[in-house]
Amino acid sequence: MQILLATVAAYLIGSVSFAVVVSAAMGLADPRSYGSKNPGATNVLRSGNKKAAILTLVGDAFKGWLAVWLVKRFGIGGEIGVALAAIAVFLGHLHPVFFRFQGGKGVATAAGVLLAVHPVLGLATALTWLIVAFFFRYSSLAALVAAVFAPIFDVFLFGTHDNPVAWAVLAMSVLLIWRHRSNISKLLAGEESRIGQKKKTGV
């Protein structure tokens, strides 16, 4: 019962869309109405408000970290509990019950989850994102590369035997890549927006 309640709680935590909440609180347009229409930090940055983008990034990462940390802190379900909380909070961000299941792509939330699973895992994945983003200026490309490497880092650090968290990390990576399928098409066509590119007037 504890595992079930923790999993549901993690999903509800993940369902808090900071892109929408922060934008509304700061009097900005709903991020689902412009740019990529994705309620995430990168799209909020297209509004031109860096503070809102940073708050969105921190909030989305924090909720991922919090959901997993709470399960670890109170020892709910061991590794299985951690794995379920990780998947649940991630799915909450992708399909938030509070926002008609119209969620983001999960990059920041996944980063928070990985930091809670193990700081080295989270930092290694975040560093991968930063390196790719710095050199290529595409948030989506950085996310895709980081998603590919996250399970590899996890296996390298912890192995695969009796490790449900490794499967959770792999599942998040697959889901994140799937959520970026339109970005993959745009990258291949040379039409993807770069980091910091503002929304077009009238969009």
UniProtKB/Swiss-Prot annotation:
This is Glycerol-3-phosphate acyltransferase. Its EC number is 2.3.1.275. Keywords: Cell inner membrane, Cell membrane, Lipid biosynthesis, Lipid metabolism, Membrane, Phospholipid biosynthesis, Phospholipid metabolism, Transferase, Transmembrane, Transmembrane helix. InterPro entries: G3P_acylTferase_PlsY (IPR003811). The chain crosses the membrane at residues 3-23, 51-71, 74-94, 116-136, 140-160, 164-178. It comes from Burkholderia mallei (strain ATCC 23344). Pathway: Lipid metabolism; phospholipid metabolism. Belongs to the PlsY family. Probably interacts with PlsX. Its main location: membrane. SMART domains: G3P_acyltransf (SM01207). GO terms for cellular component: plasma membrane. GO terms for biological process: phospholipid biosynthetic process. It is a multi-pass membrane protein. Catalyzes the transfer of an acyl group from acyl-phosphate (acyl-PO(4)) to glycerol-3-phosphate (G3P) to form lysophosphatidic acid (LPA). This enzyme utilizes acyl-phosphate as fatty acyl donor, but not acyl-CoA or acyl-ACP. HAMAP family: PlsY. The lineage of its organism: Bacteria, Pseudomonadati, Pseudomonadota, Betaproteobacteria, Burkholderiales. It is found in: Cell inner membrane. It catalyses: an acyl phosphate + sn-glycerol 3-phosphate = a 1-acyl-sn-glycero-3-phosphate + phosphate. GO terms for molecular function: acyl-phosphate glycerol-3-phosphate acyltransferase activity. The gene is plsY.
